[in-house]
């Protein structure tokens, strides 16, 4: 820690903080130092803070009142994100990183936009792939594909997170999830909604970039695969979009994004979240020719932290909060309509069994 490094305060010290953000910050000790860690579980707060020589607390207000905390990172459960972003803005912090989603409704997002404008506080949302050098390189070179793409595919195959969390660090505590009765229409709808707002939301901003008519969302089909995940086929404006994920016991994760047009196509393969393995690799194909961008030396998590430092120091322009609201609005639309479709199909299947 030096006077030139930026002081970080972390709200929520669960697996994402322990296995992703702290290892990322350990690569950026010339830029950041962790000042204080807050968690509602005092044992977790103390354990995680001890790893980085930081103070700990169970009180959000105590962390926000700490003048050495210049940047606030919000890794708490989703339902607390909006109020904590607002509180951090009002506390006069230099920049805020909020894990996705940064709000659970459009009204909450609009309140954040108002407060951020009043306090002039820059905010970024932890959609890490939007900061990945592979994605950024693709943006510079995809040309008219952004308008000519007719098919978008976004796919995740995800082994159990704890396997990779344990490789990355010693996790102090994990939330426990009860078994779910997926034959209950409300439970099935909740699983789809949670999957989209918890997992798909990572790259829905990438999908939205290719879908200018993002408010025109039609769910063509929606399936809840075993053991967990989602398979959603959408029509977004004039684009066909497939968003899918499956949680499996396989060894290798796969996280891909594709945009396909008549004359060109893009495929991006992202590196695993829990491994400091460099950036995504983007391949743009135009006829028989291929252009490859990446992998670069760091991933999207490190990219978002680098950008956060520039925001705090005022060396880059803040992101347009309106765009963050549009990203959230699109995610909510997909989640709500997909949940409704699964609720209806599950109820219909139950009625058929009972007949």
Listing of model-derived features with the role each one plays in the protein:
Residues 144-185, 216-224, 242-245:
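NAD(P)-dependent dehydrogenases' Rossmann-like dinucleotide-binding region
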Residues 191-192, 198-274, 295, 302-315, ...:
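Contiguous beta-strand/loop segments that form the cofactor/metal-binding neighborhood of enzyme cores
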């Amino acid at each position: 820690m030096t006077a030139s490094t930026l002081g970080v305060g972390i709200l929520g010290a669960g697996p994402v903080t322990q296995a992703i953000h702290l290892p990322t910050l350990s690569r950026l000790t010339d830029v950041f130092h962790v000042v204080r860690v807050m968690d509602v579980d005092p044992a977790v707060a103390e354990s995680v803070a001890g790893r980085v020589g930081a103070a700990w607390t169970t009180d959000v207000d105590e962390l926000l009142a700490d003048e050495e905390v210049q940047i606030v990172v919000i890794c708490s459960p989703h339902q607390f994100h909006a109020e904590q972003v607002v509180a951090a803005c009002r506390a006069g912090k230099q920049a805020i990183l909020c894990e996705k989603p940064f709000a659970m409704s459009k009204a909450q997002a609009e309140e954040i936009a108002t407060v951020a404008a009043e306090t002039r506080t820059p905010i970024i949302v932890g959609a890490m792939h939007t900061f990945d050098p592979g994605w950024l390189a693709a943006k510079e070179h995809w040309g008219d594909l952004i308008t000519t793409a007719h098919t978008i595919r976004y796919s995740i195959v995800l082994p159990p997170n704890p396997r990779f969390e344990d490789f990355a660090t010693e996790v102090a505590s994990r939330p426990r999830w009860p078994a779910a009765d997926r034959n209950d229409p409300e439970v099935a709808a909740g699983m789809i909604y949670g999957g989209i707002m918890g997992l798909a939301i990572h790259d829905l901003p990438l999908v939205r970039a290719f879908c200018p008519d993002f408010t025109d969302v039609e769910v063509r089909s929606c399936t809840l695969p075993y053991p967990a995940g989602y398979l959603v086929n959408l029509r977004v404006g004039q684009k066909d979009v497939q968003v899918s994920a499956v949680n499996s016991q396989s060894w290798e994760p796969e996280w891909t994004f594709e945009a396909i047009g008549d004359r060109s196509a893009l495929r991006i393969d992202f590196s695993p979240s829990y491994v400091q393995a460099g950036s995504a690799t983007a391949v743009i194909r135009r006829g028989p020719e291929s252009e490859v961008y990446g992998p670069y030396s760091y991933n999207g998590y490190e990219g978002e932290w680098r950008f956060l430092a520039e925001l705090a120091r005022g060396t880059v322009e803040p992101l347009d909060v309106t765009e963050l609201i549009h990203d959230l609005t699109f995610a909510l639309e997909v989640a709500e309509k997909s949940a409704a479709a699964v609720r209806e199909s599950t109820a219909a299947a139950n009625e058929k069994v009972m007949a």
